[in-house]
């Protein structure tokens, strides 16, 4: 694991995690937490903008193999936790499986790893081999738009990381543009999620705690030439 | 303005803004940025889960007075920028104006202030007085669910702030619960957005740069007692 992180010890130093740290505050519900395990999580919500949204979501869940991740849903969102590549694989596949021609749909998500408020449980880390939905994701060539906001936490010198993430988007032909509070990209569903996976992989190399917030949408009716 | 922030100078020290800093990197599009102005922004997307989503969104935009903020929309999201209370007022009113009985709808947003990659333009800061949609927001008593993830950036000692934000939710009767990567709350549309406004006000007192990511939804078909 990366520097500064041991189980059940508050993350000292320059961390500024906002998802609820305070591991040494006994009055807060996340008191005493922390994990050494390489758990990546993605909390996300799927929004098909159609009267038929329930069956689209349930249908997509049926087709998606989420056996390589731990999962929990509530009335607001679902969270997958486990090895990063399998978490991204499952989210990408769910989105691809929910795609329906002509239906405008978005997925809003946050990928998080290394939060000092995290726990060692609620995860699956025992799987190996090819991601179970790899073929589905590979076939997801439908065009999509996306935006991302990346928070590398707890490090002073993060500019090179941010630059790498920008250049990676350029190299991948995702046409990044800078907008207030985010970076916008465009590409296929497959290429965008592959990029998110690689952004996360980059972050793992240099920061112990990061959060990537993203939106991806398809079949938008908005005509931006207007 | 708060410590460490002057125009066009990179934020030194422990900042770990991920929305694209690197003000001294001439190869990046946000080179040379920074602002002293008290601009708060909210980038958000509205998701009515119905075939009728376009007319719901356009209808809500028609009814919402966004004259106290600067605004720009694209195919993914809209951003409002200006004084915090007016930004939150406009977003809350848009959501309240879009509410339709029986229609499941969500709004996903990020409130941001103090990013060293920010600019002084694209904002309205000249307005005073009562927020233009105050009556609409006050009347928004419909029940809603929400989650929030708060990132106070650039400070070492933020735990007290996070604790205050948690306790504030308890005091307001919003029944906060800790979930992976976020805090969940429930209350009326009005009370939830009032809370978001107050969280942002708290953050302004102690950190120069924060981001609050949130989701709010209404009329969810999910039965959590199952």
Question: Each predicted region: which residue ranges?
Answer:
Chain A
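Charge-rich, low-complexity N-terminal segments
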Residues: 3-226
């Amino acid at each position: 694991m990366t520097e500064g992180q041991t189980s059940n010890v508050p993350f000292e130093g320059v961390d500024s995690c906002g998802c609820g740290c305070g591991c040494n505050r006994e009055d807060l519900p996340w008191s005493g937490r922390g994990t050494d395990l390489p758990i990546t999580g993605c909390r996300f919500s799927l929004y098909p903008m159609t009267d038929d949204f329930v069956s689209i979501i349930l249908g997509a869940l049926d087709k998606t193999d989420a056996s390589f991740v731990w999962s929990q849903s509530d009335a607001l969102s679902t969270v997958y936790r486990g090895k990063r590549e399998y978490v991204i694989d499952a989210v990408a596949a769910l989105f691809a499986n929910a795609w329906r021609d002509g239906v405008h749909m978005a997925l809003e998500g946050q990928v998080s790893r290394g939060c000092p408020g995290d726990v060692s449980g609620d995860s699956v880390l025992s799987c190996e081999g090819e991601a179970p939905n790899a073929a589905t994701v590979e076939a997801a060539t439908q065009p999509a738009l996306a935006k991302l906001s990346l928070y590398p936490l707890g490090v002073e010198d993060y500019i090179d990381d941010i630059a790498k993430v920008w250049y990676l988007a350029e190299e991948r032909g995702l046409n990044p543009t800078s907008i207030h509070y985010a970076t916008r990209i465009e590409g296929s569903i497959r290429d965008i999620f592959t990029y998110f996976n690689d952004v996360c992989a980059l972050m793992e190399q240099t920061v112990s705690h990061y959060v990537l917030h993203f939106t991806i949408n398809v079949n938008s009716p908005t005509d931006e030439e207007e």
